From Swiss-Prot:
Lipid biosynthesis among keywords: yes
Known function: Catalyzes the reversible formation of acyl-phosphate (acyl-PO(4)) from acyl-[acyl-carrier-protein] (acyl-ACP). This enzyme utilizes acyl-ACP as fatty acyl donor, but not acyl-CoA.
Name of the protein in question: Phosphate acyltransferase
Gene: plsX
Record has ATP-binding as a keyword: no
UniProt GO MF annotations: phosphate:acyl-[acyl carrier protein] acyltransferase activity
Pathway in which this enzyme or protein is active: Lipid metabolism; phospholipid metabolism
Domain of life: Bacteria
Catalytic activities: a fatty acyl-[ACP] + phosphate = an acyl phosphate + holo-[ACP]
Species for this entry: Caldanaerobacter subterraneus subsp. tengcongensis (strain DSM 15242 / JCM 11007 / NBRC 100824 / MB4) (Thermoanaerobacter tengcongensis)
SUPFAM superfamilies, sorted: Isocitrate/Isopropylmalate dehydrogenase-like (SSF53659)
Main location: cytoplasm
GO biological process: fatty acid biosynthetic process; phospholipid biosynthetic process
Main EC class the enzyme belongs to: transferase
Length: 332
């Protein structure tokens, strides 16, 4: 399996991207990595592995650049070069921790959408009390209509099926209350479409329901989704810091911490976003993964693992098939 990695994207590029890529090569013997970046950034990697191919790109798309303009102007950027490799079929997936807007714009311009999909969605996996849930959209589409939300549900259904191994994943529509009549007109219309679909729709869910794990898929527009994502990341960090402070307060708390160290590690590991890799751009015609902007080697390794599973489970083909099956429920 051939995967392309943007070595120049993210807050800790290229060092941490390279470390994560080399770790993945060491761990997964069935992958080849095409590492894309400036020649000086990739210096010294020649001969590291026969499954590592270096692709030199002289430009980098920065986080503060306008997405569409950057994609069109910087044809030799690591991001554009990676997307072009994917388009040509030279690799099977592309991963970047770079500019999210540029990655989405480039994916749309270079790769295009799955037929029938109006808007792709960013779909991160969030940790919950009972496992994990897919959230979509997490920031790509701040304004959505009911058709967009319905399609997000279809894509989330397939993604959860293949990645979690659940035949009928539960789908919840994010709202300000669980009652059917709650929400704005878009959410109310989306509720009706989901209720009358073949999907395992459980109704409206509230913010507090997500960490409880009441469903495997949470559907919302990108504005709300991004707020949910960032809030959960912030809460996880605060809880982790509070635990560290309290358990190191004195000799007695330190002794207690030693006794529960195993449990604490499991809790912090479950709450750690780096364990869940990146977020696929579902709805794009080929596999593209967006890693977190502040990803270090561990997060990159897990994002590569996720890309491998996305390709191995043939998720995009199944999304295409599901969209065709639900064609009578979607006006394209």
């Amino acid at each position: 399996m051939k995967l392309a990695i943007d070595a120049m994207g993210g807050d800790y590029a290229p060092e941490e991207i390279i470390k994560g890529s080399l770790k993945a090569l060491d761990h997964f013997k069935d992958i080849e990595i095409f590492l894309i970046g400036k020649e000086e950034a990739l210096k010294g990697l020649e001969g590291k592995s026969e499954r590592l191919k270096l692709i030199y790109a002289s430009e980098v798309i920065e986080n503060n650049e306008a997405p569409v303009a950057a994609i069109k102007k910087k044809k030799n950027s690591s991001m554009v070069v990676g997307l072009e490799l994917l388009k040509k079929g030279e690799v099977e997936a592309f991963l970047s921790a770079g500019n999210t807007g540029a990655l989405m714009a480039g994916s749309l311009l270079i790769l295009g959408r799955i037929k029938g999909i109006k808007r792709p969605a960013l779909a991160p996996i969030l940790p919950t009390l009972n496992g994990a849930t897919v959230l979509l959209d997490a920031g790509s589409n701040t304004d959505c209509d009911e058709e967009n939300l319905f399609q997000f549900a279809v894509m989330g259904h397939v993604y959860a099926q293949k990645m979690f191994g659940i035949e009928k994943p539960r789908i919840g529509l994010f709202n300000v209350g669980t009652e059917e009549e709650k929400g704005n007109e878009v959410v109310k219309k989306a509720f009706e479409r989901l209720k009358n679909s073949r999907l395992n729709f459980i109704g409206n869910v509230e913010g507090r329901d997500i960490p409880y794990g009441v469903c495997e898929v949470v559907v919302c527009d990108g504005f709300v989704g991004n707020a949910i994502l960032k809030s959960m990341e912030g809460i996880a960090f605060v809880i982790s810091q509070l635990l560290k402070e309290e358990l190191s307060r004195n000799i007695f708390t330190k002794m207690g911490a030693l006794l529960i160290m195993g449990g604490l590690k499991r809790i912090t590991q479950k709450m750690d976003y780096t364990e869940y890799g990146g977020a696929p751009l579902l709805g794009i015609s080929k596999p593209v993964i967006k890693a977190h902007g502040n990803s270090k080697a561990k997060a990159i390794f897990n994002a590569i693992k996720q890309a491998k599973n996305l390709v191995g489970n043939d998720v995009l083909r199944h999304i295409k098939e599901e969209i065709e099956l639900t064609g009578d429920e979607i006006s394209v």
